[in-house]
Amino acid sequence: MVYTTRQIGAKNTLDYKVFIEEDGKPVSPFHDIPLYADKEENIFNMVVEIPRWTNAKLEITKEETLNPIIQDTKKGKLRYVRNCFPHHGYIHNYGAFPQTWEDPNQTHPETKAVGDNDPVDVLEIGETIGYTGQVKQVKVLGIMALLDEGETDWKVIAIDINDPLAPKLNDIEDVEKYFPGLLRATNEWFRIYKIPDGKPENQFAFSGEAKNKKYALDIIKETNESWKQLIAGKSTDSKDIALENTKVTDSPYYSASAASAIPAAAPQADAPIDKSVDKWFFISGSA
């Protein structure tokens, strides 16, 4: 399946939206794109939200029909992640698995925290920088459990199946073998990245340990089951998530007409980013 993007507005503005298209028709990256690209081989579709080494906090929105990717805001202002020395922006291609949901109505028995109400986050560690709205096929290697302001926020570690090293990476121990230092740097980055904004250091479950592939696959399956309950209208509380979709025909939220209501593409040149986003922050105790 080949997916394309439909951009509306200029990057780095409040109007910026990226819809994902299949055969020229908008689909939901939350609900319509299949989780599995190849279920037998455990190959997954990942939606790239934030390319590596960029700062804009882009995410699949839960509030709008067909869930376009937009830039997050706080108090009406666009959000950017800070540069925490020695890192620049997001240190991996950052995105999400479609058809997953970290259920905020459920407490995970091992993390002792509820889900964060988002699709499962994916950190793609391959050599190629992705682009917003790209649908990558990835293999899962492991998972970390960030505890973000009291919520479970899973971070799946994966690699693009087309990466030159993908054939050599099959489980979490292979990451340390072929990418020495990457897991440590990932742990550090997630611990400290909110500190420049005045927030406390994040914590991890499992003392920051990255769990193996089997554990990750179990979590993905659990969150896929939670999404199935959500899209079927059987969740305890759907948290006002926009559930319109164009592919899940047995869902009460299926809509054959939702795509036609999406505006035509209207891309504009990127707006400038405030120079303050370039600043480096030095965090005591990091690295």
Swiss-Prot record:
Keyword presence, DNA repair: no
Q: Under the GO molecular function aspect, what terms does this record hold?
A: inorganic diphosphate phosphatase activity; magnesium ion binding
Membrane as a keyword? no
Q: From its record, what is one biological process in GO terms? A: phosphate-containing compound metabolic process
- Catalytic reaction list: diphosphate + H2O = 2 phosphate + H(+)
Q: Where in the cell is it found?
A: Cytoplasm
Entry protein name? Inorganic pyrophosphatase
